[in-house]
Amino acid sequence: MRPILLAGHERSLNQIKFNRDGDLLFSVAKDKIVCAWWSANGERLGTYSGHLGAIWTVDVSPNTVLLATGSADNSVRLWNVKTGECVKVWEFPTAVKRVEFSPDGSKVLAVTEKRMGFLGTIAVLDINYDGDFTNQAEEPSLRITCTESKATVAGWSYLGKYIIAGHEDGSVSQYDAKTGEQLENVQAHEFDHQINDLQFSPDRTHFLTASKDKSAKLMSSRNLAILKTYVADTPLNSAAITPKKEYVILGGGQAAMDVTTTSARQGKFEARFYHKVFEDEIGRVKGHFGPLNTIHVHPAGTAYASGGEDGYVRVHHFDKPYFDFMYEVEREQLRR
């Protein structure tokens, strides 16, 4: 599995995303620009510039027409994917740490930071696809305020029915996406170990969280039941579910300030593959010189990409052995 190395950023990566078709990959870092790449060969298509601070988060609409980004300049920007122009800017009182389009692309949620007397919020913005896309609503259609512990990540469940959020204190909440009412709150991870990532399965019925407490949890979107736990030996920054095969990929590594030796092995900067059902670690992929900050899997399950503290994005297209590998139990099932 030879990786394609994408060097388009000068600073560490914050988030990467494939589009729904999987032919494009978008990456954002602390250097104020968004890069768009062909995922097949790693060729850079172009950049989207306009933000005035580090960009924390990116997401692309299901039809690959619009791109949303959230930044430390306290704004969410909406971009025309094709032309690269910024069609709308929404200003917030604090930095925006996570954006995500709803499954039908009609809304975008934005998670804002708790700072300077402002509480952390989850704002929902309605998206209009008419004309040149500039005619967008000024105000959020819904605002959820996190009074207890601020949300660090959030996403939409199946059919956009619930908004699921991961918090700084290690808990996961479920909100009604129409009213904003909190329906459920579960202490999924160790108290005060924040949740760094939350990614859904393709059908959005379950999701995976990655936390500073060195574990990832597979949870149900309907009732927040913890279905599986994957234990690692390093704080986790990102976790993704692979379609096609029953695996999960976890990424992390010691924070830069905690690393005492520079050996890549020492810092545990590998992508780890676990079996989704049996919770066993089945392999690792080395490469990054520094912690992995973000992982995203190709929607067809044929590749995955990781972005690191080292400023590189690595795209791995899976080889045949990856698809052939099976547990004895799985082989038995096939024979029946």
Curated annotation (Swiss-Prot):
Family statement: Belongs to the eIF-3 subunit I family.
Q: Which segments carry the WD repeats? A: 8-47, 50-91, 146-185, 190-229, 287-326
GO cellular component labels: eukaryotic 43S preinitiation complex; eukaryotic 48S preinitiation complex; eukaryotic translation initiation factor 3 complex, eIF3e; eukaryotic translation initiation factor 3 complex, eIF3m; nuclear periphery
Q: Which GO terms describe its molecular function?
A: RNA binding; translation initiation factor activity
GO terms under biological process: cytoplasmic translational initiation; formation of cytoplasmic translation initiation complex
Task: State what this protein does.
Answer: Component of the eukaryotic translation initiation factor 3 (eIF-3) complex, which is involved in protein synthesis of a specialized repertoire of mRNAs and, together with other initiation factors, stimulates binding of mRNA and methionyl-tRNAi to the 40S ribosome. The eIF-3 complex specifically targets and initiates translation of a subset of mRNAs involved in cell proliferation.
The gene name on file is tif34
Q: Which UniProt keywords apply?
A: Cytoplasm, Initiation factor, Protein biosynthesis, Repeat, WD repeat
Per its UniProt record, what SUPFAM superfamilies does this chain match? WD40 repeat-like
How the protein assembles, per its UniProt entry? Component of the eukaryotic translation initiation factor 3 (eIF-3) complex.
Q: Which domain of life is it from?
A: Eukaryota
The record's listing under Pfam families reads: EIF3I (PF24805)
Q: Where, per UniProt, does this protein localize? A: Cytoplasm
- Any idea what this protein is called? Eukaryotic translation initiation factor 3 subunit I
